[in-house]
Curated annotation (Swiss-Prot):
It comes from the Bacteria. It comes from Halothermothrix orenii (strain H 168 / OCM 544 / DSM 9562). Keywords: Ribonucleoprotein, Ribosomal protein, RNA-binding, rRNA-binding. GO terms for biological process: cytoplasmic translation. This is Large ribosomal subunit protein uL6. The keyword rRNA-binding applies. This protein binds to the 23S rRNA, and is important in its secondary structure. It is located near the subunit interface in the base of the L7/L12 stalk, and near the tRNA binding site of the peptidyltransferase center. The keyword Flavoprotein does not apply. GO terms for cellular component: cytosolic large ribosomal subunit. Belongs to the universal ribosomal protein uL6 family.
Amino acid sequence: MSRIGKLPVDIPEKVDVSVNDNLVTVKGPKGELTKEFNNKKVTVEVKDGQVLVRRVHDKDKDARAFQGLTRSLIDSMVEGVTNGFEKKLEMVGVGYNAKKKGKDLELEVGYSHPVIIEAEDGIEFDVEKNNKIVVRGIDKQQVGEMAAKVRAVRKPEPYKGKGIRYEGEHIRRKEGKTG
């Protein structure tokens, strides 16, 4: 059996999970997430305050993988509607700063013009000390994608380390020209 897939997902008190055929809906204090699982190899059911993901055929290797994947996605949905997710980014460089304009994010990262990143539905930006950016939301995948879009505006370069990086990310530095 899949080690992750066989574990049940516990449903907290304030969270409601419903399953209709392939559609799983999770409602909680922070919002509502819906995901469709179009996989015939696993079934999802809610029983005794837990979500159980079961394989249709025990011997199928793909079914084991999909069981673990489905369980992890449902667990992330439950976590998102209860606590939410956040990714922190930091800006390194002289004159690099960020401002929040309404819901959107304005970045000044060494270009001749400021770069504006529009917040998608369900995403919230926070700016701390003009050089730290926090991306928050209830959908783990969406938060990660928005953080990657912000980072892609000015990726960290290996010579001086300037750019936008994830908090705690280590940038391998190069030596540069010698002689």
